[in-house]
Structure formats: structure tokens, C-alpha cells
Amino acid sequence: MVNTMKTKLLCVLLLCGAVFSLPRQETYRQLARGSRAYGVACKDEITQMTYRRQESWLRPEVRSKRVEHCQCDRGQARCHTVPVNSCSEPRCFNGGTCWQAVYFSDFVCQCPAGYTGKRCEVDTRATCYEGQGVTYRGTWSTAESRVECINWNSSLLTRRTYNGRMPDAFNLGLGNHNYCRNPNGAPKPWCYVIKAGKFTSESCSVPVCSKATCGLRKYKEPQLHSTGGLFTDITSHPWQAAIFAQNRRSSGERFLCGGILISSCWVLTAAHCFQESYLPDQLKVVLGRTYRVKPGEEEQTFKVKKYIVHKEFDDDTYNNDIALLQLKSDSPQCAQESDSVRAICLPEANLQLPDWTECELSGYGKHKSSSPFYSEQLKEGHVRLYPSSRCAPKFLFNKTVTNNMLCAGDTRSGEIYPNVHDACQGDSGGPLVCMNDNHMTLLGIISWGVGCGEKDVPGVYTKVTNYLGWIRDNMHL
């Protein structure tokens, strides 16, 4: 009888997991001077998240592949192991491993070193912010007055404009943490704090990063003119990429599209370049090349780990004409910065340059629409940003123009400037860049047009400011 009872007890422990109270869990009581305590909660020392009484969560065990189900009970987390399977779709960013609970609908991410958060979205090594800090995902949690920030998930913030339980909280960087964020485009990251017994928002003391090297170059004045633009050197456009694809029915490869280096391991391009489906290992990206097929002394070549085409790309209107390629490398860094290879700066979400601002495009495309071949040398063109009123169907032979597009064209004409600068076939996926704050900044991706170099007919580009969230989210997947 005793043996039977022991056997049953052992089965229960194996099936359900041994419930226990972790000594490292601490009771979390937040107090405001002169006010009442507003709730005892549990703080998970592994995930650094706080939970309300009776709230439950999953967490990965340290140094193992097991997962625990925890519940906050009177200030202590009571946990037991539960069975899990690999998630059916990617949910974790920055290389995290996703585990789906077998008996209930919840998942947990096992994060690599340097990342934490529900989806490994928090970068524990981020010590400063860039621009206004809209994309800051670090762990700074102190306001300028040295007061500790309040957790965005706190019930005290339920009626506040921004909190960790609002529908788009995750995209704004909000969640179960008290880290400084900038969900509303303020001048810098901020958080909610309690001062003199009252709630208020306050800017954080997180430092701004030193100015990045993105968008810098050693510009060489073009010496030779060509139909549709000017022959140039890669050092004038070090963010220019060339994408090649293997031939399907013969050996060798063919030039596919242009691309734009936006970080060490990521290249931005146009979605319509992949209307024919390719496997990632059928693609190659070349950086630092002045001549389309002739190798350069400082060029860098990469295989493609994966590529992501916007799910809502419309191959009829070319709406959402954007795609990302992740370069393959044996180390965390892919492209090595040099005079011939450098990332372009991405714009701030609210960047709006004046109408008719002069910008540049570059690519290895055809000289004109009737040309049988692509250009052998990289070319550049100088165009101006059109007002939205001129970026409309009636100026583009009644073709559809959406809010995700912008227009730019060469406004020079006449006998003095018979050569109208414009993008053409083969330039697709390449950059439209403009000077902003002394750095060249990406405004558009070469997408489509009516002919090439037609007088008073602008080229159409994917509007990059509309896709900053999409770019950030997919780079972290």
C-alpha cells in the first residue's frame, strides 16, 4: 500500500511538476510618501518583470530548455515545470527561441545573451539613444530628477494615454517593465514617475549616442555624363548594394536589383524584385562595387540568410514595395565599414523635407528604357522632391499613387539640360537619399515610373518613413 501511494505521488510530481517557492523572488511593494500602499506584487528576478496578485506567466529555466509556469501568490512566485513545444510561427526577436505551452495558449521566449523581455525585444546593452529615441529599447529606468520610473503595466497607468496594456503597446516599446521609452515622438525618451505624491511624466537621463557614421561619404565629383545620369564611384554612394540571383536554367548568375545597406547585416530593397520566388541561397549581395559585374578592390560579398517581402505588397499598383535581406555571416557583424561600404541613415518618423529639396538616386540600371543592357558602371542622378499635389495619377498617366509613395524628378529642362536624370529598369530597390543634418538620409526606395527620363514625369519611390516600424520589427525577428 505504501509503495502504491509513493508511485502515485511520483506520477503526480512528474506530470504536474513540483510546485515550489523561489527564494530569489522578492515581495514588491511600491510606496508613495504620504500615500497608501498600492498593491503587493511579485517581481521575477529572471525576467525582471512584475506581476499582480494571482497573475500567472511562463518563464524559461536558466541553463536548460525547460519552461516553468508561475503564479503570484501573496508576494511570492510559485512555479512548476510544464510541457512545451516549439512555436508554429516566429514570435521572438533578436534570435530568441519560442516555446508554446502544450495545455494552454501562452508562449515564452528563451532570449540570447544581451536581450530580455516577453519577446526578447529589450536590449540590455543599449546604453544610449539615437535621434529622439523612438526606437530606443534599452533598460534605462531613471528620470532626470533621479526618480525611478513606474512600470508601464502598472494599474495606476490604466487611464493614462500610454501604458503597457494598450493595443499597440508592444510596437511602441511598452510592456511589463519600467524602462524609458518615447511612444509619442517627444524630444527624448521619458517615463511616468511619482513626485510629491502625484503622477507625472518626465524625461529620462539616458544619454544620447554620439553622432553615427551612417550617411557619411567621400564624394567624388562625376567626370562623365551618361543618358539618365552621371557615371560615379562607389565611394560617393557606399550604401549602394547589388543583388544577384542564380540563373534557373544555366550556370552563372544575373544582376537582379539594387539595394541599400541600412546596417551591418541588413539590406533594404524593393518587393517587386522577388516576384519570381527565390530560395535565399540562390541570392548574393555585393557591396563596395563601382562596376556592375567587374569585381572591385574593396568589395564585400555575402550570401543571403533570409529575405522578407512585405506581406501586403501589391504587384499591380506596387503599393508596399519594400523588402529586407539579411546577410549571412559567421560573426555578429557582416559588412565592414570602409570608404566603399557604409550604411545609410534611416530617417526619423516625422522627417519632412521641404518640397523641391534636391536629392540623389543611384544604381546600375539602363541608360534609357530602350537600352538593351544595364549600365556597366554605377550612375547617380540628381532629382527634386515633388509636392504631394504633383505626385498624383493625373501626372503619371492615371497610374495609382498611394500614401506609401513619394515622387521625385529632374526639374531641369531645355537646351542647357537635355539629359533628364531619372531611375530606369535595373535601378529598382536602390536608394533615394537626401542631405539631413549633414548626413545623407534614406527617403525613398526606387520603385516604378512611366518610361525613363520623361520631361515633367517624376519617378515614384517607396516612402521609407511609413515603414520604419516594419523595418525595425522584421530586423529583430
Swiss-Prot record:
Please report the stretch or stretches of sequence annotated as the Kringle domain: 128-209
Identify the catalytic residues.
272, 321, 428
Q: Which GO terms describe its biological process?
A: plasminogen activation; platelet-derived growth factor receptor signaling pathway; smooth muscle cell migration
**Assembly information from the UniProt record:** Monomer.
- Source organism per entry reads Desmodus rotundus
* Keyword field: Disulfide bond, EGF-like domain, Glycoprotein, Hydrolase, Kringle, Plasminogen activation, Protease, Secreted, Serine protease, Signal
Q: Which residues form the Fibronectin type-I domain?
A: 40-82
State the compartments where it is located. Secreted
Do the record's keywords include Disulfide bond? yes
Q: What is this protein called?
A: Salivary plasminogen activator alpha 1
- Coiled coil start-end: none
Ranges for the EGF-like domain? 83-121
Its predominant location is secreted
GO CC, any one term: extracellular space
Cystine pairs annotated here are 42-72, 70-79, 87-98, 92-109, 111-120, 128-209, 149-191, 180-204, 214-345, 257-273, 265-334, 359-434, 391-407, 424-452
A Pfam family name for this chain? fn1
Q: How is its activity regulated?
A: Activity toward plasminogen is stimulated in the presence of fibrin I.
Its signal peptide is 1-36
Q: What parts of the sequence cross the membrane?
A: none
